[in-house]
């Protein structure tokens, strides 16, 4: 039976968010997809049904750019399909503005945009290096007031507030291959009277969206956020989106600083407990290195409707990924690496890997929960020592699904049961004594940011163990023995998320033996080449 669903597919470079409207819901649904010219279908991870919106929705991930896909949903006897083409990584440019090489102390204001048929590119003149250094005498290096604009290869220094300001409602802006440093006011706790919170390398005002922020080096703001010993951190941020229109991709950036010039959030925004927020909907955050944050490395809070966060390396932070709230969902957090977490300069105890939370707001006189969206948390690897103390924060949590994660933590793994709708946690490795042994031996040594699983690991075999050595019986108490790595081939199959596993079952954690490792940071971007600010010295 073919039903006339109202269907919608919203692509990015490597993902498609899909929406199939169905007034009553027809029970659990199945999703499958294929390249439009292919014969073989692939199974996707099942969608969720949201009775509030009367629709099935979910995401397909790991897709190829600039490729047409056919997506089919089946719910009971009902079936519907839609075609969608992922974004091309090549932007058609019909107007180019070359900025004269050298140092400029004037704000660049972009008031002329392009269109869907052709973008307006702003870049240094060929063979030159353009530096905007406004010496803290202007609030911004660049102000974007038009749609379909590309900023490429610029060096932006010493903005008084935000280095790049994207005005309210502006859409379709690409910021790529830029170096941004030294922006913002002095940070610090609000109880000290400091008001310079959220000064950002890239700041998008409400309603802006469809932003691509990629391959940038964002580092060392002028000020620094306070740590938790003086209250909630407040200070500079790398990227901030305020009540975005959605459709954003933030990928392959390196966002870093020092502890004394640390960020509040690396990637963040607002409004948190809302049905909009940052990045709001149909957005991807992947391939980034984010560090030196006193609150959240990645803050994805608000609607989180078909938001995907994957393959990020996160360290020197308090919270790795913040998700309070996830009002609509689904939010997918998968194959990230969670490194060092700390509370303050003095307290290295650690925060939490995933912040949750919700509240109730009044909409048209109705009390509405902001905590009913699904969170899918798959195949992440948490490192120790000095990683997050707890996996989840202690806030009320519903509709969280966790699978195949290495959650090495010294504190609480899962939050208390808050009743219906319930969470679903399974096939994770949790605790501070994983596998009953020496956790470091679980991973193969590497000089790169990768943590593939060793086939075997060391563990303590408790008790008195006798063995034959040289014809004699020798008894050893609590010997260290080699044992099978408990993360190898121990995961659950998750269609669309781990189809390419190479063993008897998927490995637990972010790295699958026999497959390429996730790569992080701007230099890991496919086809990466150095920008003029690196080559024209």
Predicted regions span which residues?
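Surface-exposed loop/turn segments connecting beta-strands in extracellular beta-rich domains
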Residues: 130, 138, 154, 158-160, ...
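C-terminal accessory segments
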Residues: 438-532
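Structural beta-strand segments of beta-rich domains
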Residues: 14-18
